[in-house]
Amino acid sequence: MSQYAAELCKLLITDNFGELYAPLPRIVQNTRLSPRQVRHGLAVLIQQRLIYHYTSLDDGIAYYEASWMTAYNLVRSGRILQLVEEKLGKYVAKVLSTILYHGHVRISYLETLPELRPQVSSKAGKLVAANGLNGIHSDEEEEEEDAHVTDQGEQEEYASGRPENSVDSDYGKRSASQLHPALRSLAAYGYIMRVRDAHFQSPADLVEDAERAVSSRSDVRGLKGKKFQEAIDAGVETYIKEKTDGTIPQGPLAGALPRGIKRRAGQLATNSSSKRVKLEHLPEGDEDIDDDDFYGDDYVDGDNTLMDPNMIISVNYQKFEVALRNRRLARLAEQCTSRVTSQVYEALLGRIELKTPACRKQPERVPEGEENEQYSVAIPLHTILDDIDPDLDLSESMAGVDPANLLSNGHMGLNGDGNGDDDDDESTGASTGIWNRRRNRVYELEQHLSLLAQEPNIFSTRSMQSGMITWAVEFRHLARRLRHLEIERIIESRFGTIAVRVIRVLAAKGKLDEKRLQEISLMASKELRQVLARMEAAGFVDLQEVPRDAQRQPSRTMYLWFFDLDRVARMVLEDTYKCMSRCLQRIGVERNKLKLFLEKTERTDVKGNEEKYLSPAELKTLKEWRDKEALLLGEVGRLDELVSVLRDY
């Protein structure tokens, strides 16, 4: 863990949970807190999974270690909630926000929280939440409540005879009926996971326990040498996978795709209808029913099966890394192709996301050039077609094609003749037309996927499995492509387009002397030297001296320029951590300058009624503060995207 990464994590923890991070004796000494208060603070950090803890079986001493990756993930809370809200709705995002706030939480505790109870219409003409708080309701809910109100006398009797914050006996059931489908939808996407005891152990302690358990097995003790080490490595990997597996089972369909996953209408740029991802493998007797029932604007599964109330759940950040990576790749595909093609690619990535637990198999990143190819699961072509919005015009960004020659594989087009019989009835003609339109749509879809498979990006890869056309994505190549683009963007902004040309030549050719580099890049010697000197001073290129003899004289020495992407990425990553820390520190400084004023605006009576209680000068100050805070937080979010590309993808 680097210096600036530690500084950034401290600032994030301070901003979210207060100044309770330091060695325990130092906290007791500096803050004058009692050991009991310090232990409570330590429990809060464990609750948020910000530290690992391990009690040794030998001496019984508890050891603690900072989980800096969990601390860093606090900065992604906004992006995570925005993604979930766009996919699954506001209520599911509220549920996930509550889980984020508590770190890890039991499902039975979520059922008792008033903010997660749905808002239901009362007979008094008001929208009353299950905890009794008034809310805002829509026109549809007004019509529903008007249907339940019979006369004015009944309204008065309800308003006077029952307290306003009371609810019907079935409100709790409605709360559970909405909470559990929301949790199931999060579990279906893999956005939440079941908390295991091993999740509170540091990776090093977990490996030590795994080695101890595997080496004590009878089938391993008899081995020696290389076979013994291979058995230990394989056993440790299996042990850790079993102990840390937090997958929430999905009932009888746990081995296939989850039932009930729906696409949000806002997921596509066009006004597409909400459409559930169809199952690839359904048990016999089950029908793939497209049920588009929603509770308000949020997703609600038709299955009323309750989840285990004793299950402890938390946010699965690794799965969100996969989802955020897919979004970044979809944006890159839109920049390189077209909007319609990017939506096709988004459908392919969405299906792959369901079967991809993490961005990488190993937590540490492999150096540039040593990464093996990592293909995703292969998705059949017809499955991608079913996931695409049927109203999306796939031929919009394609050159004009004669419908009669649209299907070059022998299938008839829209105007084709199926069997030469002109006396077919209307039903046969209609079914044939639907079949032909689907054939044409398959052809158009394959054209978009073929465009994505072109050099130099190679967004997708075509293959055949059991005679079926399938498409997959090679993520390691795309991750390298993203890293190169980000590094080139930074170099261009600091040194100009000529520097990008030099970097690309060095990345492609390796180590070059100045004369050879000048010939390839087609640049003047003076201009090339200036660019190389500036980039070397900033640390983006390196110079290696190779003497031709033992005297090591400058005249007998070759000077080779080279570009080390891994070192540059680490350097940029450290600078990014530092920049994020400075942004958060600046927010704290600006907040302290307006401390008394901001405390006034955060009062419950003022919040939401600023125009009523604040003067025009105070309103102007508040607007300036919010704009400044949004600017700094937006910069932190953009820097986090850079960290994701350089470190996580």
Curated annotation (Swiss-Prot):
Compartments (UniProt record): Nucleus
GO cellular component, one term: RNA polymerase III complex
GO molecular function, one term: single-stranded DNA binding
InterPro entries associated with the record: POLR3C_WHD (IPR055207), RNA_pol_III_RPC82-rel_HTH (IPR013197), RNA_pol_III_Rpc82_C (IPR008806), RPC3 (IPR039748), WH-like_DNA-bd_sf (IPR036388), WH_DNA-bd_sf (IPR036390)
Principal location listed in the UniProt entry: nucleus
Keywords: DNA-directed RNA polymerase, Nucleus, Transcription, Zinc
Keyword Nucleus applies: yes
Family classification: Belongs to the RNA polymerase beta chain family.
Role this protein plays: DNA-dependent RNA polymerase catalyzes the transcription of DNA into RNA using the four ribonucleoside triphosphates as substrates. Specific core component of RNA polymerase III which synthesizes small RNAs, such as 5S rRNA and tRNAs.
Protein name listed in UniProt: DNA-directed RNA polymerase III subunit rpc3
Name of the coding gene: RPC82
